[in-house]
């Protein structure tokens, strides 16, 4: 038994070499398309297997299981699921702009539904698909052995149409990815013809023909032309695509919005689910309902909350929050004709395709020319045989080795003699000289044409252009499949916030928040608080009279502000809903709840004894996570947020020292810790109060309201320690004993 040979190598180098081999295999054999035919190896093998099965567009369908079996058995030694998924995608009209496979059965839906099992579905090639493999039998492309060496497969497809840009491609390899959107074939053909006529054309010339992507699902590209041009010039970028919608008038002045097209690669079911979640979370108050009325065409019906809602504003709010507006990435990373992957711009991709077509036409012409020369040689021999028919027949009948004798006597070549000997005697007798002469003459004309094509580049490019025009005519803008589906409409995005309160009926409400953080609203003002019920162990904390159109500010003990629309607060006489469901307040307490008023000054104070004034406009939060305004040190909390409705402020803390000073001494800030309000030593600030000096300082002690007019003794500068409060001040060191 032979001993295993062990070779000592550096582990890092070995790992590096193997990973590099894996990466190259992934890039070259799986993830990136070839710039010439726009296909990956699995696509190429699948389509070639269908060609071998003769699944022509005018033939019958065959079970997909048969096709997949041939692919994995002969060409692609991978899982059947991966191959079938590829087949399904090539047949989906919402995935490919120009489907390559004609499927029969359930091939999935735009909702994201899976296709039926391969044993139930059937398929065949489309007319577009046949163009990819046109003339493949005329030595136009190289073939290589399959994985087991038992058969041959094409290295590349002849590709009579620019499949890479027409159908697009996407894939992720090791360290690189590609994402090429589909385009309109008619426009691509125009660009190719222009490039043939003007070989030195620049990208800007090409962009005049190719305006932008053309998605199978339609939609509207809303980016400016400059953005699209920049993406095509660099080969990288992104484009924004919006759904197409229309306003549908109903009776009594009402209307509904109907979405007829959605962005490319957006699943309709997930889009509806996304909108439904926003409806449930009350994030889109201008929308009351959404329903799916789609059949074989998209029809999403969106009902506005009120007939007075501007449909444009409704849709703008949906575009911002949902996939009704989507961003399509563009990264034209492909494998070039030199087998090197790189990012190409649109001009380079079109040039590579034209060079490929030039090579295909050259190889095809050479192949046909050789076939004609071969036939002409045979015809020359057949004519000699016709002129010496009796002698030929006699030699064939009487001689054991007629081949050598015929070559010697009649100066025939081996090919000519083989052709004569392979012809039946009966057929030899029926030979007519004129037929031979006519065929010989026609072939000579074809030979002259082919030689002109091969010897004259202008003639060759004429053929390339003619074939591109043929494709354009067959699948142009005037055809059902060729008409442009995606349109362009420049939209300038603004940061303007839609005032949704304009569409809410203004009604008085009373907002109730309990100590445990349960919030609700009741209709009207002057509510009988004795009828309000709370959960066991809970009680009232804040009672706030407001209107449904108001915005409510919630201040947490960590100094973070949250904003709620009053109309979105749970209504009814139940216990309401937890504030944690409405905002991300975490385990922090609620310091205060108040109605937002524009340009109102608010006083913030923390238990560390610091505070500052802030404009109410600065504390408005746009998200559920809120906005951090006051920075509170560890171990301390924000104890107060009060509207400034007086000229003086009173502070008191654990040290039971009362300090009164002018509110003008406190600076206005946007955020921060603030300045020292009252000085403490090993104590915390417990409460503050804003009041007018003329009215005096009041407090509530066990239900008795006390007003102190003489506050001179407690006056001081901001940052002082203060003095003991007057007799009768609450023992809890707060301005209310409750």
From Swiss-Prot:
Enzyme Commission designation: 5.6.2.2
Per its record, the protein catalyses: ATP-dependent breakage, passage and rejoining of double-stranded DNA
- Residues of the site described as Interaction with DNA: 40, 76, 78
Matching Gene3D superfamilies = 3.30.1360.40, DNA gyrase/topoisomerase IV, subunit A, C-terminal, Topoisomerase II, domain 5, Topoisomerase, domain 3
Q: Has the keyword Ion transport been applied to this entry?
A: no
The residues annotated as site (Transition state stabilizer) are 119
Q: Which InterPro entries match?
A: GyrA/parC_rep, Gyrase/topoIV_suA_C, Topo_IIA-like_dom_sf, Topo_IIA_A/C_ab, Topo_IIA_A_a_sf, Topo_IIA_dom_A, TopoIV_A_Gneg, Type_II_DNA_Topoisomerases
Question: Taking every annotated instance into account, which residue ranges of this chain make up the domain Topo IIA-type catalytic?
Answer: 32-496
Q: Which GO terms describe its biological process?
A: chromosome segregation; DNA topological change
Q: Does the keyword Cell membrane apply?
A: yes
Membrane topology (UniProt)? Peripheral membrane protein
Principal localization?
membrane
The entry's active site is 120
Q: How does this polypeptide assemble, per the annotation?
A: Heterotetramer composed of ParC and ParE.
The record's similarity note reads: Belongs to the type II topoisomerase GyrA/ParC subunit family. ParC type 1 subfamily.
Q: Which HAMAP family match?
A: ParC_type1
Question: What is the annotated role of this protein in its UniProt record?
Answer: Topoisomerase IV is essential for chromosome segregation. It relaxes supercoiled DNA. Performs the decatenation events required during the replication of a circular DNA molecule.
Protein known as = DNA topoisomerase 4 subunit A
This protein's species is Rickettsia conorii (strain ATCC VR-613 / Malish 7)
């Amino acid at each position: 038994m032979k001993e295993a040979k062990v070779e000592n190598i550096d582990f890092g180098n070995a790992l590096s070499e193997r990973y590099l081999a894996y990466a190259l295999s992934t890039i070259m054999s799986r993830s990136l398309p070839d710039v010439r035919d726009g296909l990956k190896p699995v696509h190429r093998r699948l389509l070639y297997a269908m060609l071998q099965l003769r699944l022509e567009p005018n033939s019958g369908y065959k079970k997909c299981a048969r096709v997949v079996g041939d692919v994995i058995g002969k060409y692609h030694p991978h899982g059947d699921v991966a191959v079938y998924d590829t087949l399904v995608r090539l047949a989906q009209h919402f995935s490919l702009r120009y489907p390559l496979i004609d499927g029969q059965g359930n091939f999935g839906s735009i909702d994201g539904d899976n296709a039926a099992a391969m044993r139930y579905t059937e398929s065949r090639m489309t007319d577009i698909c046949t163009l990819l493999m046109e003339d493949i039998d005329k030595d136009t492309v190289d073939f290589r052995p399959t994985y087991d060496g038992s058969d041959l497969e094409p290295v590349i497809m002849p590709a009579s149409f620019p499949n890479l840009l027409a159908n697009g491609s996407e894939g992720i390899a090791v360290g690189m990815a590609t994402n090429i959107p589909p385009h309109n074939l008619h426009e691509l053909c125009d660009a190719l013809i222009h490039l043939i006529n003007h070989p030195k054309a620049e990208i800007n010339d090409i962009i005049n023909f190719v305006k932008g992507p053309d998605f199978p699902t339609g939609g509207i590209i809303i980016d400016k032309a400059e953005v699209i041009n920049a993406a095509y010039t660099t080969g990288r970028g992104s484009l924004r695509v919006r759904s197409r919608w229309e306003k549908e008038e109903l009776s009594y002045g009402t209307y509904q919005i109907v979405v007829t097209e959605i962005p490319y690669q957006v699943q309709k079911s997930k889009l509806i689910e996304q909108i439904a979640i926003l409806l449930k979370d009350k994030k889109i108050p201008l929308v009351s309902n959404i329903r799916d009325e789609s059949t074989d065409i998209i029809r999403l019906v969106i009902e506005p909350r009120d007939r007075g809602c501007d449909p444009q504003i409704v849709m703008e709010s949906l575009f911002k929050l949902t996939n009704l507006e989507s961003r399509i990435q563009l990264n034209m990373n492909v494998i070039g004709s030199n087998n090197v992957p790189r990012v190409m711009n649109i001009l380079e991709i079109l040039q590579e395709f034209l060079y490929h077509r030039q090579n295909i036409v050259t190889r095809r012409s050479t192949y046909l020319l050789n076939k004609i020369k071969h036939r002409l040689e045979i015809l020359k021999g057949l004519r000699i045989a016709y002129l010496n028919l009796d002698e030929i027949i006699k030699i064939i009948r009487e001689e054991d080795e007629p081949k050598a004798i015929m070559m010697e006597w009649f100066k025939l070549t081996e090919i000519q003699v083989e052709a004569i000997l392979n012809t039946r005697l009966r057929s030899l007798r029926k030979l007519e000289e004129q037929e031979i002469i006519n065929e010989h003459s026609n072939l000579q004309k074809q030979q002259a044409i082919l030689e002109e094509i091969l010897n004259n580049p202008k003639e060759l490019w004429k053929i390339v252009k003619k074939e591109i025009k043929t494709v354009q005519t067959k699948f142009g803008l005037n055809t059902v499949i060729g008409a442009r589906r995606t349109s362009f409409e420049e939209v300038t995005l603004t940061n303007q916030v839609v005032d949704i309160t304009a569409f809410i009926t203004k009604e008085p409400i009373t907002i109730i928040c309990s100590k445990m953080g349960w919030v609700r609203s009741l209709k009207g003002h002057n509510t009988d608080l004795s009828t309000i019920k709370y959960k066991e162990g809970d009680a009232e904390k804040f009672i706030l009279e407001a209107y449904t159109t108001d915005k409510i500010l919630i201040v947490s003990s960590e100094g973070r502000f949250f904003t709620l629309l009053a109309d979105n607060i749970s209504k009814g006489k139940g216990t309401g809903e937890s504030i944690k469901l409405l905002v991300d307040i975490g385990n922090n307490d609620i310091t205060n709840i108040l109605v937002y008023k524009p340009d109102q000054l608010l006083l913030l104070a923390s238990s560390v004894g610091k505070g500052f004034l802030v404009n109410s406009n600065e504390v408005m939060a746009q998200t559920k996570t809120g906005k951090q305004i006051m920075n509170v040190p560890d171990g301390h909390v924000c104890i107060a947020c009060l509207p400034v409705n007086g000229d003086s402020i009173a502070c008191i803390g654990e040290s039971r020292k009362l300090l009164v000073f002018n509110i003008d001494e406190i600076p206005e800030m946007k955020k921060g810790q603030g300045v020292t309000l009252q000085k403490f030593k090993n104590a915390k600030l417990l409460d503050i109060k804003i009041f007018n000096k003329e009215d005096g300082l009041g407090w509530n002690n066990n239900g008795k309201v006390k007003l102190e007019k003489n506050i001179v003794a407690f006056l001081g500068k901001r940052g002082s320690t203060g003095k003991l409060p007057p007799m009768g001040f609450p023992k809890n060191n707060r301005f209310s004993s409750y």
